[in-house]
Amino acid sequence: NNIKESLNKNDGQLQNRVISATYPPGSVFKIAVLFAALENKVITNSTYYYNCTGSDQINDKEKLNCNNLAGHGIQTLGEVFANSCNPAFYDIAKKVGKDEIYKAIKTLHLDQKVDLGLDEEVNSNIPNEISLSNLSIGQGSLGITPIQINQMTQIIANNGLYKPLYIYDSIINSDMKQIKELTTSKEEELISPYTSTQIKQFMIGVAKTGTAKLLNDIDGGCGVKTGTAQSSVNNKEVTHGWITGFYPVENPKYAITVLIEGTEENSKSAIPMFKEICENIKPW
């Protein structure tokens, strides 16, 4: 019952993980890779195909496995995204190049705090030395906060328009005097409407026929990207489950991100939680 003692504990039980903890984003980061590829026109929806055999060779000693070890076969770009095919995204990353993916990270504000106005917010960890194979699927030493992922989704849902997120304008004391004013960034178009519309359609496909097809009966529809990410906690390998998306499909009103820590496989808990949120906030 000692609040101060609980707040100072190192186990993070009372830590606001949405803004002050970073996690490998896993496959939700494929949104950024896809954006880089489409915006730079290295692939197109109508011309890109990939034959997934279940893995792709990285070098003489390493290979990148797909979540479907039997292989997905020949896929369109929409199917690649819906199936979250790792070898295909490695292929896309090789076409677009690491430099352009890092530029996409910057464009989508994944390299800076969201700056809600809370002091405990931390920034992402995006080292330069991440291998292209890990970068293509959001693994390795990448660390991004859930609120940063949610802001990326918000930008996509807003047709490429960045709108600053904040929870207050100013703070006043008991004498009604302003003691702090929050300064926010200006609205800015970061992604062309054409590219953002394509990504939104791919995300809708994930909810209809892809890794989140359990969401295909949501009233109003949604667009999402799921992900699982491996990391180490207290020298123990754990898997986190992600889902980020927008709701409803027409004139989206909400960007929603769910992260389940440590016990996930194939986002099995994150997907129904996302669905429950949508069902309880639907605006009709």
Please place each PLM-identified region on the residue numbering.
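Beta-lactam-recognizing serine transpeptidase/beta-lactamase-like catalytic domain environment
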Residues: 1-26, 32-260, 266
